């Protein structure tokens, strides 16, 4: 059955317009980009097959556009639309950070770090530098490592913060294993960063650990006190 033969309120596009994007499943959202689907399938079934064979959603969408276009049911047009939508989401969140809006909503900052770091095959430690009104000044990836970890140097974080005339920083790093639970080493590095930044009156507002699922906030755990 073609999607046009479905009840109107169950078609992905009409459902999105009537109830909002959050009402759609992953497959329904992906189906909007798929378009007509493969021969003998509707777009939602093609999207389900894509998620089943090449998913889940995060690793599927972390692929570059050139890799997406080779997947059955997508092609160049759909791949470009997906890549453009993801980049727009990234830029939208960064613009909110630059205006200081998203910093009143810690999960949004965590999502930003997740967008930047989650697809990396090795560990990356990044810093978001903020002014005295907690607006974003710059985002920098300062340290990289292997799949097992990255060497973090608090003095370099302090040096870059002073260079940017930052009043506060938020840091984050990814766990390539996919497990976002902070390790003892993560907590130890956080304490060293906190102490080093306090010496120059710069606040460490949070440390996010990025893996599969929701980023873990060390501030939320009470580990930055």
Curated annotation (Swiss-Prot):
<dbReference type="InterPro" id="IPR037518">
    <property type="entry name" value="MPN"/>
</dbReference>
<dbReference type="GO" id="GO:0006508">
    <property type="term" value="P:proteolysis"/>
</dbReference>
<dbReference type="GO" id="GO:0046872">
    <property type="term" value="F:metal ion binding"/>
</dbReference>
<feature type="binding site">
    <location>
        <position position="175"/>
    </location>
    <ligand>
        <name>Zn(2+)</name>
    </ligand>
</feature>
<feature type="short sequence motif" description="JAMM motif">
    <location>
        <begin position="173"/>
        <end position="186"/>
    </location>
</feature>
<protein>
    <recommendedName>
        <fullName>UPF0758 protein XOO0495</fullName>
    </recommendedName>
</protein>
<feature type="binding site">
    <location>
        <position position="186"/>
    </location>
    <ligand>
        <name>Zn(2+)</name>
    </ligand>
</feature>
<feature type="domain" description="MPN">
    <location>
        <begin position="102"/>
        <end position="224"/>
    </location>
</feature>
<dbReference type="GO" id="GO:0008237">
    <property type="term" value="F:metallopeptidase activity"/>
</dbReference>
<dbReference type="InterPro" id="IPR001405">
    <property type="entry name" value="UPF0758"/>
</dbReference>
<dbReference type="InterPro" id="IPR010994">
    <property type="entry name" value="RuvA_2-like"/>
</dbReference>
<keyword id="KW-0645">Protease</keyword>
<feature type="binding site">
    <location>
        <position position="173"/>
    </location>
    <ligand>
        <name>Zn(2+)</name>
    </ligand>
</feature>
<keyword id="KW-0479">Metal-binding</keyword>
<keyword id="KW-0482">Metalloprotease</keyword>
<dbReference type="InterPro" id="IPR025657">
    <property type="entry name" value="RadC_JAB"/>
</dbReference>
<dbReference type="InterPro" id="IPR046778">
    <property type="entry name" value="UPF0758_N"/>
</dbReference>
<dbReference type="Pfam" id="PF20582">
    <property type="entry name" value="UPF0758_N"/>
</dbReference>
<keyword id="KW-0862">Zinc</keyword>
<keyword id="KW-0378">Hydrolase</keyword>
<dbReference type="InterPro" id="IPR020891">
    <property type="entry name" value="UPF0758_CS"/>
</dbReference>
<comment type="similarity">
    <text>Belongs to the UPF0758 family.</text>
</comment>
<dbReference type="Pfam" id="PF04002">
    <property type="entry name" value="RadC"/>
</dbReference>
